[in-house]
């Protein structure tokens, strides 16, 4: 089920991109881009969707738009994808804003936020609350345009050996977070 929903979402997104970027494929010359990835294609959902996205764009454009997916490290290290796109050494990147925090401190707000809003609330903020516009303004300072291609639900961040009853119980506790932990 999850795989079918993901494929449908990627198909719709890719269709929109093809019409915006390519238009009439027969009247266009071929565009070939390199897309560096921060995720290996064998990683469920976020990794496997990169090559699917590339292939769908190629098919729907009749080959006029060919974005070649590169595994992490093939063009640049995984955490350097954003910088490679900003500098022009790759035309596209398959990454997450959470990996851009060193360059853009606000970037994690455009990805999964630990203990943050649920998926519906987050998508509403992006679309109706100015989230996309804010992201576009921030990324434009680096010459990059971000497109939200996939949504990962917020991290619950917690299977613990003992019950958490107060903030004091969190002191010294180690928890994994993808981009940054709340202060």
Predicted feature locations:
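Bacterial N-terminal signal peptides
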Residues: 9-20
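Boundary at the C-terminal end of the N-terminal hydrophobic targeting segment
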Residues: 25-29
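Short, hydrophobic alpha-helical packing/hinge segments within bilobed ligand-binding/sensory domains
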Residues: 78-82
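Short, polar/charged alpha-helical segment
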Residues: 42-68, 183
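N-terminal secretory signal peptides that target proteins for export/translocation
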Residues: 1-6
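Contiguous mixed-secondary-structure segments that line small-molecule binding/active-site clefts
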Residues: 54-55, 86, 91, 96-183
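Short beta-strand-to-loop elements that line the ligand-binding cleft
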Residues: 67-76, 175-177
